[in-house]
Amino acid sequence: MNKVLSLVFVQFLFFGLTVSAQTISPIIVECGKKCRGEFSIINNGLTPLAVTVEARSFSLDTLGHAINRSLDPGVDLRLEEGSARISPRGTHTFAYQLKCSAPPCSIALLSSMVVGHTAEGILVRIQLAHTVYACEKQKDCRKQVRAAAGVAVN
């Protein structure tokens, strides 16, 4: 019985150390046509992580799925950093300033990172999105954008 428990403990320890996920916080932000904000990437892994941030404008289809495109001409976005190296179990905060000349503006800040590779050697890259909705007024901005796209608003 002790041998079985020891084996279970070793498996738990092994899988507990190898299974990890990167996280982003906050996921969604609503603001006025001018805003400052920041988001954090947390590396829950045991190896350093290189992260790059790409800004994209997006619109929503009637099902609420995002359709990404390059930044709209009326969007002035300034990222303090476009990339970073995050230490194991570390956190990095990216700050930005956004001005939207023709609200509403919907922006996705896509953080890309390579988290491993397949048995065939293909790199596995993930993207985590920090979404910014900018309207004339901050209150219910996301609901306004979703309603304008024809998405059912709760």
PLM regions and their residue ranges:
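Sec/Tat signal peptide C-region and signal peptidase I cleavage site
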Residues: L17-T23
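Intrinsically disordered, low-complexity Pro/Gly/Ser/Thr-rich segments with frequent PxxP/GP/PP motifs
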Residues: R69-A102
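Positively charged n-region of N-terminal signal peptides that target proteins for export
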Residues: M1-V4
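Short acidic, flexible loop segments centered on an aromatic residue
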Residues: L46-L71, S112
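Asparagine-centered strand-capping/turn motif at beta-strand->loop junctions
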Residues: I41-T47, N154
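Short, solvent-exposed loop/turn segments enriched in Ser/Thr/Gly
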Residues: G32-E38, G90-F94, P104-L110, I126
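Terminal connector regions
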Residues: K99-Q144
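Bacterial N-terminal signal peptides
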Residues: L7-G16
